[in-house]
Amino acid sequence: MELKLMKTQKLTPLAQWLIIAKLNHCFKGNHLSMQEIADLFKVERISIRRAAEQLEAHGFAHRVRGKGVDMHKVYLDWDKGKVQLWEAAIKYMKPPCVRHYHVKTPANMELFTPGGLHLLSERTTHKKIDGKPHLVYKGFSQSRKRNEALIERVRPSEADYVVEFWSYPPILPGKDEMDNLSLYLSTDATGDRDMEMNHALILTTFDWDGHGHYTPRRFRRTPLSGIFGR
């Protein structure tokens, strides 16, 4: 019964990051100890253990004990190839959370995830006209500085703009920019028809095997130009 309940739940952020890290070739080989993963993500081992329990409940990975001199170690083994893992896991993945701020003037603001030093945030600014917000700006920003830019928040009655922030997972270990699969989840959640072309392009251009090849044929869409292309 407990397993059944867990399989209906959305993935926790850490479990989701582990899957996306696996798909983005952040792990060397298929066999990493729980401690190595905890060190890689700079989180406590208990957090990795809970994420592993959820991955096991969904049938995405399983834990095994090492042999010989490594008997004291517990390893995480992945049960699916990259394409199969993505196809199976996407229905349990969550889009980034959204926050709204009422402001006098539009400005950038940093939002950091728990345990993440780096964050990519999407900002949508709505101009208030006749008391109702209207879309006037949409874009992506990336920064490594926590207080690079702040926003002046005011009461809704005093605001001229409503700024919408999308909070993404931290940049993956060994990477220096946001990964395309997290962008895919974020654009899917926006409900913005202008993003649909970029949304299709993300899967088309994702490097599934680590050698620069594009997405498998069953994921292919019409090639499009956009900010997410490689």
Predicted regions and their residues:
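Long, low-complexity, charge-rich intrinsically disordered regions
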Residues: 1, 87-230
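Short alpha-helical segments that sit at the start of domains
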Residues: 1-21
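Short glycine/proline-centered loop/turn elements that form peptide/ligand docking sites
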Residues: 9-15, 30, 50, 54, ...
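Short helix-capping/hinge SLiMs at alpha-helix to coil transitions
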Residues: 23-29, 173-174
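Short acidic, hydrophobic short linear motifs in intrinsically disordered regions
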Residues: 27-41
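Short amphipathic alpha-helical interaction segments
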Residues: 42-57
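A short, conserved structural fragment
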Residues: 56-67
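Minor-groove-contacting beta-hairpin "wing" of winged helix-turn-helix DNA-binding domains
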Residues: 67-77
